[in-house]
């Protein structure tokens, strides 16, 4: 890229602003060495890196990529075999820590930031070296006691020796016999040895070695002979400490030297990441965007802003290379022609450097292999060159180098010489560049160049807008419309007397005045039309906004209506559910009352049946003659023992042993009766064959009729509860001890109703759900009382 063009377009000032966004010297070096690229793929890569950095700033603004140092000097020093001091080693450890942390950060987010992750993958992880340095060096740069066992031992001995010396000297300075010889009762250090300040006139009273004298000469710093050997021991220990520290530092430095290559690559990656993040911060600062890039040399900049201008900047639209290759910008001085020229050139350089550009989304830029610029007055006093000669030197060089992939920016082309000759020369230069295929933007005052643009293919006029009402430039660039210099209006606004301006107008030809008036009228009409267009666009925008607002209101109302209707429906359903629950509760209460009534009736029937059974038993007892059964009446009967009732030809169980009357309380099935002892035989004894008694037959028939299972599936809850109530009574009469109520799994409501009925039931001892093989959740097993 042409170095002169970079300077004329003030590319270096962009780099200075960019460097201020960097966080390291390594990053700043990369920035100041940066130049525009001319390879599309390389530029795209740089732009994507900047975009990823911008994304990181947006999504994770507090992510920290600092904490590392520029340790290139330390790596070189260690590589040459030198010993690094503690601060240098600590800088290496801090850099290793930062690199490891940053690598882990991007490793966890490699899908979000693939390019940043790729750069960070070069960061080396040396946890062992990092640990050794941080264990050995304290944050302040002091070597830690635990750096080695030897150092810890030496320092313990050193502390003990220092304590002994101080204690001895403290004893001396507190001694009344010595205090009169001392300048002050203190212990101090001179030349690394502990001494006391002695008045010079008492030198002979304090035997020892003089190490120093005060500036006034009145005080001698003497090491008493009593502590000389102890001080010598201190010096030996201090020397040993120094040697051990040097050994530790040498060992750590050797570790750094061993890994100098990977650490250097890691440092380079850290610098590259800082470089990328500086570009991202600069993009954020400028509110810039990544342009759309393509291979052909062209530009379509929308709402572009010059990055170096402060305050409110009027954006410009400028295009080149699609419909035309040469753009001639005309208009007044101070109207913004040069700024438009510099903006176009600088945004091209920024984009090809991987920087986002301060322009609107959708801006497109092609790749220019060369950018040339002739901007400003570069007159050289040393070379005795005029303005015109200086410009011509630049243009001659540009014509010799420009080609199809070149962008040429020419400010005030043909200025500095005779207007007629300058205009002719300017046309010829533009023709030459046009025929070479260069993309050219030129500013000029010459009206002849407006005609040139109108008569040549792929050459277009443009102008910087001048407000005919306020007589001030608007700084907007209008492509397709030639401009006027507006010299008289500007001169009048700047204070030139009106009569001078009028006199100047009188020198113009009638044709020129007529053309100028026509141009002015056309410009005014165009500005009014543009103002009307903008007003129409604003009204259309307001109408769209109102439409969107009313549509939103309508949607909100529809949503609220749906919400109200939905809420009303829910409330209605809630009322229905509540009414249904109340009705079900009333029905359940009625059924419970009916069930209680039926239970009472069944209880009465059972009592009547029992009474009939008791009477029948008595009748049968009288009717059945006493049989003679072999064996004797059992002696020593105990409760629970099984016995055979000879009269009834049935087995039973002893409930109570024989009483005073010689009768035994025995239970046969559900019947309890007192039986004379003589009518009982132990079960193991033989019994006579014969038919069953009438009572036994009734009981056995009842037991045969009642199944131990009751299937309730398919019944409503109230029907099932009545069935259960009747069944429990029948099962109890039949002498069943366990029954199975089959209710199925279903929703569980029938099971719950049955369990409520069983809880506290007079016939129920306990109940549980069926186990595996018994029917599981679909069966309730009931133990009868």
UniProtKB/Swiss-Prot annotation:
Ranges of residues in domain Smr: 710-785
Keywords: ATP-binding, DNA-binding, Endonuclease, Hydrolase, Nuclease, Nucleotide-binding, RNA-binding, rRNA-binding
BP terms from Gene Ontology: mismatch repair; negative regulation of DNA recombination; rescue of stalled ribosome
Record bears the keyword Nuclease: yes
Binding site for ATP: 331-338
PROSITE patterns: DNA_MISMATCH_REPAIR_2 (PS00486), SMR (PS50828)
EC number: 3.1.-.-, 3.6.4.-
InterPro entries found in the cross-reference section: DNA_mismatch_repair_MutS_C, DNA_mismatch_repair_MutS_core, DNA_mismatch_repair_MutS_sf, MSSS, MutS, MutS2, P-loop_NTPase, Smr_dom
Subunit structure: Homodimer. Binds to stalled ribosomes, contacting rRNA.
Family listed: Belongs to the DNA mismatch repair MutS family. MutS2 subfamily.
Job description of the protein: Endonuclease that is involved in the suppression of homologous recombination and thus may have a key role in the control of bacterial genetic diversity. Acts as a ribosome collision sensor, splitting the ribosome into its 2 subunits. Detects stalled/collided 70S ribosomes which it binds and splits by an ATP-hydrolysis driven conformational change. Acts upstream of the ribosome quality control system (RQC), a ribosome-associated complex that mediates the extraction of incompletely synthesized nascent chains from stalled ribosomes and their subsequent degradation. Probably generates substrates for RQC.
Protein name: Endonuclease MutS2
Organism: Pelotomaculum thermopropionicum (strain DSM 13744 / JCM 10971 / SI)
């Amino acid at each position: 890229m042409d170095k002169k063009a970079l300077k004329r377009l003030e590319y270096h000032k962009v780099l200075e602003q960019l460097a201020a966004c960097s966080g390291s010297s390594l990053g700043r070096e990369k920035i100041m060495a940066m130049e525009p690229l001319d390879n599309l793929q390389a530029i795209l890569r740089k732009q994507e890196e900047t975009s990823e950095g911008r994304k990181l700033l947006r999504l994770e603004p507090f992510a920290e990529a600092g904490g590392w140092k520029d340790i290139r000097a330390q790596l070189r020093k260690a590589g040459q075999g030198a010993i690094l001091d503690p601060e240098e080693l600590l800088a290496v450890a801090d850099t290793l820590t930062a690199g490891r942390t940053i690598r882990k950060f991007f490793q966890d987010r490699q899908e979000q930031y693939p390019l940043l992750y790729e750069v960070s993958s070069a960061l080396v992880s040396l946890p062992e070296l990092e640990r050794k340095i941080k264990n050995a060096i304290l944050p302040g740069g002091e070597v830690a006691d635990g750096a080695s066992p030897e150092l810890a031992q030496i320092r313990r001995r050193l502390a003990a020796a220092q304590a002994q010396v101080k204690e001895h000297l403290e004893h001396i300075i507190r001694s009344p016999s010595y205090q009169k010889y001392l300048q002050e009762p203190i212990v101090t250090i001179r030349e690394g040895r502990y001494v006391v300040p002695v008045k010079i006139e008492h030198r002979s009273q304090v035997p020892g070695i003089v190490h120093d004298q005060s500036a006034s000469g009145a005080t001698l710093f003497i090491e008493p002979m009593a502590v000389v050997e102890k001080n010598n021991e201190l010096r030996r220990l201090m020397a040993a400490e120094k040697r051990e520290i040097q050994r530790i530092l040498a060992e750590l430095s050797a570790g750094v030297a061993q890994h100098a290559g990977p650490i250097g690559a890691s440092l380079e990656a850290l610098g590259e990441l800082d470089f990328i993040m500086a570009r991202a911060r600069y993009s954020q600062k400028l509110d810039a965007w990544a342009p759309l890039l393509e291979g052909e040399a062209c530009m379509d900049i929308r709402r572009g802003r010059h990055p170096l201008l402060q305050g409110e900047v009027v954006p410009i639209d400028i295009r080149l290379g699609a419909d035309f290759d040469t753009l001639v910008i005309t208009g007044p001085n101070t109207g913004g022609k040069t700024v438009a020229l510099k903006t176009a050139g600088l945004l091209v350089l920024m984009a090809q450097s991987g920087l986002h550009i301060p322009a609107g989304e959708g801006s497109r830029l092609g790749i220019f292999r060369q950018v040339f610029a002739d901007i400003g007055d570069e007159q050289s006093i040393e070379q005795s060159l005029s303005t015109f000669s200086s410009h011509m030197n630049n243009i001659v060089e540009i014509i010799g180098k420009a080609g199809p992939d070149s962008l040429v920016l020419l400010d005030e082309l043909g200025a500095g010489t005779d207007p007629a000759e300058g205009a002719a020369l300017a046309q010829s230069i533009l023709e030459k560049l046009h025929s070479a295929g260069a993309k050219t933007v030129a500013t000029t005052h010459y009206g002849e160049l407006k005609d040139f643009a109108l008569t040549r293919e792929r050459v277009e006029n443009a102008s910087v807008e001048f407000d005919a009402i306020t007589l001030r430039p608007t700084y907007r660039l209008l492509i397709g419309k030639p401009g006027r210099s507006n010299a008289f209006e500007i001169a009048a606004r700047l204070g030139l007397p009106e009569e001078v301006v009028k006199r100047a107008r009188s020198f113009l030809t009638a044709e020129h005045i007529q053309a100028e008036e026509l141009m002015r009228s056309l410009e005014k009409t165009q500005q009014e039309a543009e103002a009307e267009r903008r007003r129409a666009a604003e009204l259309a925008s307001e109408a769209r906004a109102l439409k969107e607002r009313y549509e939103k209101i309508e949607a909100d109302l529809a949503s609220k209506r749906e919400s109200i209707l939905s809420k009303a429906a829910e409330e209605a359903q809630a009322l229905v559910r509540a009414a249904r629950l109340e009705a079900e509760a009333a029905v359940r209460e009625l059924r419970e009352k009916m069930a209680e009534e039926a239970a009472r009736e069944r209880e009465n029937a059972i009592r009547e049946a029992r009474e009939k059974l008791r009477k029948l038993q008595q009748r049968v007892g009288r009717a059945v003659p006493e049989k003679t059964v072999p064996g004797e009446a059992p002696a020593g009967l105990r409760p629970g023992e099984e016995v055979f009732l000879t009269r009834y030809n049935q087995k039973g169980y002893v409930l109570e042993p024989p009483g005073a009357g010689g009768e035994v309380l025995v239970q046969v099935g559900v019947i309890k009766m007192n039986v004379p002892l003589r009518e009982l035989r132990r079960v193991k004894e033989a019994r006579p064959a014969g038919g069953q008694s009438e009572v036994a037959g009734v009981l056995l028939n009842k037991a045969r009729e009642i199944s131990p299972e009751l299937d309730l599936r398919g019944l409503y809850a109230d029907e099932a509860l009545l069935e259960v109530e009747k069944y429990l009574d029948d099962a109890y009469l039949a002498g069943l001890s366990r029954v199975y109520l089959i209710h199925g799994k279903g929703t569980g409501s029938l099971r719950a109703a049955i369990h409520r009925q069983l809880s506290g039931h007079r016939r129920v001892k306990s109940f549980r759900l069926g186990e595996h093989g018994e029917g599981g959740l679909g069966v309730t097993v009931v133990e009868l009382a």
